[in-house]
C-alpha cells in the first residue's frame, strides 16, 4: 500500500510543480502587461483671453492610463495637477449631479465625470467647450445667457393665494407627483441646449430645450396656480416655436431625459390654451 502511495505521489508532485510554474509565468505576464505604459493622447481646446495675441488652438497631452482614473475628468485633473496647471475647466461633484463639467468630448456633449476614457490608444480623444457658446477660457463656456433664460421662466412654485404660505403643505396625489418624473432630474448642465441647431442660431430669443423642459415641469405641477400665465409668456414666435424636433437634445442628455417630448407637450398645451382664449 505504501509503495502505491509513493508512486502516486511521484506522479502527482511533478505535475503540480509544473502547473505552479505555469501559473507563476501567467501571473508574471499579466503583471508585465499591467505595468507596461498605456499612453493615451488628449487634444484639448485652449484659449486664454489674457494672453495678447493668443488664438484658439488644440494642445495635446499624453497620459498613462495605468496611473489615471477611468473617467475623462480624471484625466483632466491629472493634466492640471501634474502637467499643465494653466488648463482651465469647471468641475465639482464628480458624480454626474451638479452639471459643472459639461463639455464636448469626441464630438458629443456630455459630462466629463461620467464619460469613460476611450481606451483605444490609437485614437486621440478630443475635448472642446460646449459648442456655440462664448468661451471665458479653455473649456469654460459663458453660461450667463443660459441662466438668465432659466430665471425668466420663474422656476419655482407660484400660488395666487399666498395667505397659507408657510403654514401648510401643498399635497399631491401619487399620480400628480409621477408627472414630474423625468423632468425634475435635470441638472442644468446645458448639454442639450448647446447641441440644438435652433439654439445655436437663435440662442438670444429661443429658450432652448433645457429651459423649456423646466418651464413644462412647473406648468404641470398640480400645486402651481400660474400655468396659463406661464404659457402666455411663450406665445411669441421664438421662445417656444424655434424647436423643430431635431431631437439632438434627447440624444445627448447625460441624465437620459427627454426635453424634446416636454417641448412637444408644451405645444399641445399651447394649442388648447389658444383655443380657450379665442373662444372666451
Curated annotation (Swiss-Prot):
GO terms for biological process: aerobic respiration; mitochondrial electron transport, succinate to ubiquinone; respiratory electron transport chain; tricarboxylic acid cycle. [4Fe-4S] cluster binds at residues 186, 189, 192, 253. [3Fe-4S] cluster binds at residues 196, 243, 249. Its EC number is 1.3.5.1, 1.1.5.-. Gene3D superfamilies: 3.10.20.30, Alpha-helical ferredoxin. It comes from the Eukaryota. It is a peripheral membrane protein. InterPro entries: 2Fe-2S_ferredoxin-like_sf (IPR036010), 2Fe-2S_ferredoxin-type (IPR001041), 2Fe2S_fd_BS (IPR006058), 4Fe4S_Fe-S-bd (IPR017896), 4Fe4S_Fe_S_CS (IPR017900), Beta-grasp_dom_sf (IPR012675), Helical_ferredxn (IPR009051), SDH/FRD_Iron-Sulfur (IPR050573). Keywords: 2Fe-2S, 3Fe-4S, 4Fe-4S, Acetylation, Electron transport, Iron, Iron-sulfur, Membrane, Metal-binding, Mitochondrion, Mitochondrion inner membrane, Oxidoreductase, Transit peptide, Transport, Tricarboxylic acid cycle. GO terms for molecular function: 2 iron, 2 sulfur cluster binding; 3 iron, 4 sulfur cluster binding; 4 iron, 4 sulfur cluster binding; electron transfer activity; metal ion binding; succinate dehydrogenase (quinone) activity; ubiquinone binding. Residues 146-218 are annotated as: Interaction with SDHAF1. Enol-oxaloacetate inhibits the succinate dehydrogenase activity. Residues 176-206 form the 4Fe-4S ferredoxin-type domain. [2Fe-2S] cluster binds at residues 93, 98, 101, 113. The keyword Electron transport applies. Residues 1-28 form a transit peptide. It catalyses: a quinone + succinate = fumarate + a quinol; (R)-malate + a quinone = enol-oxaloacetate + a quinol; (S)-malate + a quinone = enol-oxaloacetate + a quinol. The modification N6-acetyllysine is found at residues 51, 55. CDD domains: fer2. One of its GO terms (cellular component) is mitochondrial membrane. It is found in: Mitochondrion inner membrane. Belongs to the succinate dehydrogenase/fumarate reductase iron-sulfur protein family. Iron-sulfur protein (IP) subunit of the succinate dehydrogenase complex (mitochondrial respiratory chain complex II), responsible for transferring electrons from succinate to ubiquinone (coenzyme Q). SDH also oxidizes malate to the non-canonical enol form of oxaloacetate, enol-oxaloacetate. Enol-oxaloacetate, which is a potent inhibitor of the succinate dehydrogenase activity, is further isomerized into keto-oxaloacetate. This is Succinate dehydrogenase [ubiquinone] iron-sulfur subunit, mitochondrial. It comes from Sus scrofa. The lineage of its organism: Eukaryota, Metazoa, Chordata, Craniata, Vertebrata.
Amino acid at each position: 500500500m505504501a509503495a502505491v502511495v509513493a508512486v502516486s505521489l511521484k506522479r502527482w508532485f511533478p505535475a503540480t510543480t509544473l502547473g505552479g510554474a505555469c501559473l507563476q509565468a501567467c501571473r508574471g505576464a499579466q503583471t508585465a502587461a499591467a505595468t507596461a505604459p498605456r499612453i493615451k493622447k488628449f487634444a484639448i481646446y485652449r484659449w486664454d483671453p489674457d494672453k495678447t495675441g493668443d488664438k484658439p488652438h488644440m494642445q495635446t497631452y499624453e497620459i498613462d492610463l495605468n496611473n489615471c482614473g477611468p473617467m475623462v475628468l480624471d484625466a483632466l485633473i491629472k493634466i492640471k495637477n501634474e502637467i499643465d496647471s494653466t488648463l482651465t475647466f469647471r468641475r465639482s461633484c464628480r458624480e454626474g449631479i451638479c452639471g459643472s463639467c459639461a463639455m464636448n468630448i469626441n464630438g458629443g456633449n456630455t459630462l466629463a465625470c461620467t464619460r469613460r476614457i476611450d481606451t483605444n490608444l490609437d485614437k486621440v480623444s478630443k475635448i472642446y467647450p460646449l459648442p456655440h457658446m462664448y468661451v471665458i477660457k479653455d473649456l469654460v463656456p459663458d453660461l450667463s445667457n443660459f441662466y438668465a433664460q432659466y430665471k425668466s421662466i420663474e422656476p419655482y412654485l407660484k400660488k395666487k393665494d399666498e395667505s397659507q404660505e408657510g403654514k401648510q403643505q401643498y399635497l399631491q396625489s401619487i399620480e400628480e407627483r409621477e408627472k414630474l418624473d423625468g423632468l425634475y432630474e435635470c441638472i442644468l448642465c446645458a448639454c442639450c441646449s448647446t447641441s440644438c441647431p435652433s439654439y445655436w442660431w437663435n440662442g438670444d430669443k429661443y429658450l432652448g430645450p433645457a429651459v423649456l423642459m423646466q418651464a413644462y415641469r412647473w406648468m404641470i405641477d398640480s400645486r402651481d396656480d400660474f400655468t396659463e400665465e406661464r404659457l402666455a409668456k411663450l406665445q411669441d414666435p421664438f421662445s417656444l416655436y424655434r424647436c423643430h424636433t431635431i431631437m439632438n437634445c434627447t440624444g445627448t442628455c447625460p441624465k437620459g431625459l427627454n426635453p424634446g417630448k416636454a417641448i412637444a407637450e408644451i405645444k399641445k398645451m399651447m394649442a388648447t390654451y389658444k383655443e380657450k382664449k379665442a373662444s372666451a
